[in-house]
Amino acid sequence: MDPNCSCTTGGSCACAGSCKCKECKCTSCKKCCCSCCPVGCAKCAQGCVCKGSSEKCRCCA
């Protein structure tokens, strides 16, 4: 589990727009940094939306 997030890996979560998760893997969260983003992606904090490593992030394209 991410120390900055109460979400469980791969589970549902109630992250808000202010979510500070570093590597949130919640399937229901659209505000956390995505696993398909490169490390240090500055745009993750701006609401990057993608669901997994097989999907390219629109914010990182």
UniProtKB/Swiss-Prot annotation:
Annotated stretches, region: Alpha: 30-61
Residues that coordinate or bind a divalent metal cation 6: C37, C41, C44, C60
Residue span of region Beta: 1-29
Binding site for a divalent metal cation 3: C15, C19, C24, C29
Job description of the protein: Metallothioneins have a high content of cysteine residues that bind various heavy metals; these proteins are transcriptionally regulated by both heavy metals and glucocorticoids.
Family: Belongs to the metallothionein superfamily. Type 1 family.
Record's keyword terms, sorted: Cadmium, Copper, Metal-binding, Metal-thiolate cluster, Zinc
Matches recorded under InterPro entries: Metalthion_dom_sf, Metalthion_dom_sf_vert, Metalthion_vert, Metalthion_vert_metal_BS
Biological processes annotated in GO: cellular response to cadmium ion; cellular response to copper ion; cellular response to zinc ion; detoxification of copper ion; intracellular zinc ion homeostasis; negative regulation of growth
Residues where a divalent metal cation 2 binds: C7, C13, C15, C26
Free-text note regarding domains: Class I metallothioneins contain 2 metal-binding domains: four divalent ions are chelated within cluster A of the alpha domain and are coordinated via cysteinyl thiolate bridges to 11 cysteine ligands. Cluster B, the corresponding region within the beta domain, can ligate three divalent ions to 9 cysteines.
Protein name, as recorded: Metallothionein-1B
The protein's assembly and partners: Monomer.
Residue numbers binding a divalent metal cation 5: C34, C36, C37, C50
Lineage: Eukaryota, Metazoa, Chordata, Craniata, Vertebrata
Stored PROSITE patterns: METALLOTHIONEIN_VRT (PS00203)
Gene3D superfamilies: Metallothionein Isoform II (4.10.10.10)
GO molecular function: metal ion binding; zinc ion binding
